[in-house]
UniProtKB/Swiss-Prot annotation:
Is responsible for the charging of tRNA(Phe) with phenylalanine in mitochondrial translation. To a lesser extent, also catalyzes direct attachment of m-Tyr (an oxidized version of Phe) to tRNA(Phe), thereby opening the way for delivery of the misacylated tRNA to the ribosome and incorporation of ROS-damaged amino acid into proteins. Residues 379-471 form the FDX-ACB domain. Monomer. InterPro entries: aa-tRNA-synth_II (IPR006195), aa-tRNA-synth_II/BPL/LPL (IPR045864), Fdx_antiC-bd (IPR005121), Fdx_antiC-bd_sf (IPR036690), Phe-tRNA-synth_IIc_mito (IPR004530), Phenylalanyl-tRNA_Synthase (IPR002319). CDD domains: PheRS_alpha_core. The gene is Fars2. Its EC number is 6.1.1.20. This is Phenylalanine--tRNA ligase, mitochondrial. It catalyses: tRNA(Phe) + L-phenylalanine + ATP = L-phenylalanyl-tRNA(Phe) + AMP + diphosphate + H(+). The keyword Ribosomal protein does not apply.
Length: 472
């Protein structure tokens, strides 16, 4: 029999909707005994109601698509929790920039902002970065919207324009970012980015260059694969050289000397030329960051028309998983001491590798205590696989809507979701999807009975909230 608590949780937590007369803190919920109708939790949000987050109120509309699972992560700020692996990466990057790059008064050149609110306007997240109105990155299915005008930032780049407009020329921004995405060991709806920006005046860029006083930052020409229409080739090449030198030094600081690096041309709306940096780590090429010469239109609109600059962005989880051998992105949200205590280091630059097995004395028998502490597994508990298949509704279905339901109902019991089959009926032309959900707890073994209750709750929530027709 389906566990009603899971079903109620799906209805109660999937989309945060409240009557205006009952606006409250974002973690207050309806009583378990009152089971609301599925129509109250439509994917399109609840126009006329209000969402409260971080002390501010936001009217909901047809773009509201936040889940309680995601909202519960807002304010956790893992990157600011001392000794957390993401904090260690942030501190190592910050220390490197503080020590390597000094201003005229021998103070750090780069300022650091790691407590900016994750709630931004859609203008900040998209328009300020020159992202076109029809760009696919704006899709409701890929982002978490509070309403049409506000969202949880999809990247730390959302703060670039504001900080440039405030007169800053060199800064790092660190924060949690939110994207609707697939479910596997490498992806989570909340992750953390570190953004870097540096602007140069004509004097700063050409200082030390022979005949530098005769060189210019800007010209009127045509855009090419190598530069923007407003930049001189001399300026672009110097900015590009500085950017790549700064980032090569950074990854060498993190990974050690002798690291092999390569640059891959790519595209970002807010930089040109743009690059991805890859490193050869243990014989495998890994992408670690994206970067490029900032679009001058962005720089000009922020009030820095006399400067040219670069920007880069990297994912803290990606670096931490490689540096510390962390196998599953869910672990970053663990409060298990067996995980956290491994990163309490006296020196942030100390080498550490996550141990999947370790000694846990309290589980040992009396005889074992005499012989030594017991060796216990961490996150290697057996997986349980369950499939779900259903006919899609005629419209308004996205896979990310289903993934959000799975995350909301199953929480961190869900390790992975794979679309394993698509079928179109030859007569009705209806489409069916079949997903395989992998359940695995990070700290204990799950029973099939326990998983079946969660899985059945996922099935019912999908039917009631997405309008699919079950084939189970």
């Amino acid at each position: 029999m389906v566990c009603l608590a899971f079903i109620r949780a799906a209805h109660e937590h999937l989309y945060l909707v409240r009557k205006v007369s009952h606006v409250c803190r974002c973690h207050q919920h309806r009583a378990w005994g009152s089971r609301p109708a599925a129509s109250q939790f439509a994917v399109q949000g609840a126009p006329g109601r209000v969402l409260e987050l971080l002390g501010k109120s936001y009217p909901q509309d047809d773009h509201t698509n936040l889940t309680q699972k995601v909202l519960s992560k807002v304010g956790r700020n893992l990157h600011n929790q001392k000794f957390h692996p993401l904090w260690l990466i942030k501190e190592r990057v910050k220390e490197h920039f503080y020590q390597q790059y000094m201003g005229r008064s021998r103070t750090p050149l780069f300022s650091v902002y790691d407590q900016l609110s994750p709630v931004v306007t859609t203008w900040q997240n998209f328009d300020s970065l020159l992202i076109p109105a029809d760009h696919p990155s704006r899709k409701k299915g890929d982002n978490y919207y509070l309403n049409r005008g506000h969202m949880l930032r999809a990247h730390t780049s959302a703060h670039q324009w504001d900080l440039l407009h405030a007169g800053l020329n060199a800064f790092l921004v660190v924060g949690d970012v939110y994207r609707r995405d697939q479910i596997d060991s490498q992806h989570y709806p909340v992750f953390h980015q570190l953004e870097g920006v540096r602007l140069f005046s004509k004097h700063e860029l050409f200082a030390g260059v022979k005949d530098g006083e005769s060189l210019q930052l800007f010209e009127e020409s045509s855009r090419s694969a190598h530069k923007q229409e407003t930049h001189t080739m001399e300026a672009v090449k110097l900015v590009e050289f500085d950017l790549k030198q700064v980032l090569t030094r950074l990854v060498t600081h993190l990974f050690g000397d002798g690291l092999e690096v390569r640059w891959v041309d790519c595209y970002f709306p807010f930089t040109h030329p743009s690059f991805e940096m890859e490193i050869n780590f243990r014989g495998e090429w890994l992408e670690v960051l994206g970067c490029g010469v900032m679009e001058q239109q962005l720089v000009n609109s922020a009030g820095a028309q006399d400067r040219i600059g670069w920007a880069f962005g990297l994912g803290l989880e990606r670096l931490a998983m490689v540096l510390y051998d962390i196998p599953d992105i869910r672990l970053f949200w663990s409060e298990d001491e067996r995980f956290l205590k491994q990163f309490r280091l006296s020196d942030i630059n100390q080498s550490v590798k996550f141990q999947r097995w370790f000694f846990q004395e309290e589980r040992a028998t009396g005889i074992q205590r005499k012989m030594g502490r017991q060796l216990c597994p961490f996150s290697k508990y057996p997986a349980v696989f369950n499939d779900i298949s259903f006919w899609l509704p005629s419209e308004n279905y996205t896979e990310n809507d289903f993934y959000d339901i799975v995350r909301t109902v199953g929480g961190d019991l869900v390790e992975k979701v794979d679309l394993i089959d698509k079928f179109e009926h030859p007569k009705t032309h209806r489409t069916s999807h079949c997903y395989r959900i992998t359940y695995r707890h990070m700290e204990r073994t799950l029973s099939q009975r326990e998983v079946s209750s969660v899985h059945q709750a996922v099935q019912e929530a999908a039917v009631q909230l997405l309008g699919v027709e079950g084939r189970f």
